[in-house]
Amino acid sequence: MPKVVVAGSINTDVLTTMRRAPRPGETVSGETVAFGRGGKGLNQAVAAARQGVAVEFIGRVGRDAFGDQALAFFKANGVGTRGIARTDTATGTAIVMVDASAENSIVVIPAANGEVSPADLEAVTIEPGDILVSQFEIPRATIAAFFRRGRAAGGLTVLNAAPALDDAPDSLWADVDILVVNETELGHFAGVEVPGDAAEDAVAAAARRLMRRPGQTVVATLGVRGALAVTADDQVIVPGRKVKAVDTTGAGDCFVGSLAARLAQGDALPQAMRHANVAASIAVTRVGAGDAMPTADEVLALSV
């Protein structure tokens, strides 16, 4: 069976709660602090591994406690770590401050993630049929090299174009087989407004604006409304599932990782999307990001 190879970010999430966030120059007393595993790359890799496929990761962590914890988390979830290099730069970190009204402020420090280089890609062998996944939390030049190498080896490339950036080179889009975006990212890259209640035809039209060559697929995740995929001449719609969401932090990452896993297992795109949609609907009922990813058995129990 083909494997999933993720080149991406690894973060430690530091979540703090307080009655209100501090003003400039002010110190306030916090209430709780929690540490979790995160980073879009880590989340997507763990989501894929929990669906029962072989997963290899390419990235960087620091020679620090957060790096040790990230490697242990990968190994506990069956993600291969041969492609993860240690560096003197700190492990990527996200500091999240949440006040009593649930409003949050987030500071993301890329740190070691910003040093992932094309040379790091050599640590993992790409084979025909492998699914290559990346996101915009490592250098764009590395993503481009990753996808060129993957397509040359007969792999399928999946780009989660998040977070939405202004410096994505057009040449990168051409090496993407499946592009996954949410409504905000879709509007950003298509140059049109895509409101949360946009009609399916409007979403599909915006998605087709992102295609750069024949054979590409654009998948738009639509939150509670599900997901929509378009090719040059076809369209797939997967309706959402009604659940009581408690934390949507890792929903998109869960969708991407689960989609990649099912494609590696031989599903056609519509079936893979349905599985990924159910997986994401489970993830939002749990607190956290990497820790919230469901197993294949949990997803299959709710699939019809």
Which residues fall in each region the model found?
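Ribokinase/PfkB-type carbohydrate-kinase core domain
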Residues: 1-10, 72-86, 96-235, 298
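Short acidic/glycine-enriched loop/turn segments that link adjacent beta-strands
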Residues: 89-92
